[in-house]
Amino acid sequence: MPRVKGGTVTRQRRKKIMKLAKGYRGAKHMQFKAASTQLFVSYKYAFRDRRRRKSDFRKLWIARINAAARQNDISYSKLMHGLKLAGVDMNRKMLADIAYNDSKTFAQLADTAKKALN
């Protein structure tokens, strides 16, 4: 039986890997083995960080709300509890956007939370 070398299939597979590895430094964009190893790691990081992005944004929103709340003489936890008692149903993303862009409206929300706590 004659030896089968793979031919076009192997070349296409390697070409695809090398195309995906464009922009990597050193051997990782030139050598197939290094490129395929790095791609595996890159996809692993991408998978992990797609999930991590959600918690990163939540942390950012909480930090922004807390900073704006403390300017209005109330802590983050008391603000959130007060808004819940007052029946204000806003998620952290919306609150952070209001705190960042519209401080007067946020001050009104903080006053609403303070009144609900008393």
Curated annotation (Swiss-Prot):
Record GO cellular component, one term: ribosome
Q: Could you state one GO biological process linked to this protein? A: translation
* Entries under PROSITE patterns matching the protein: RIBOSOMAL_L20
One GO term in the molecular function aspect is: structural constituent of ribosome
Q: Which keywords does this chain's UniProt record carry?
A: Ribonucleoprotein, Ribosomal protein, RNA-binding, rRNA-binding
Check the record and name the HAMAP family matching this protein: Ribosomal_bL20 (MF_00382)
The family classification in the record reads:
Belongs to the bacterial ribosomal protein bL20 family.
The task this protein performs is described as: Binds directly to 23S ribosomal RNA and is necessary for the in vitro assembly process of the 50S ribosomal subunit. It is not involved in the protein synthesizing functions of that subunit.
What is the name of this protein?
Large ribosomal subunit protein bL20
Task: Please spell out the taxonomic lineage of the organism that makes this protein.
Answer: Bacteria, Bacillati, Bacillota, Bacilli, Lactobacillales
The primary gene name is: rplT
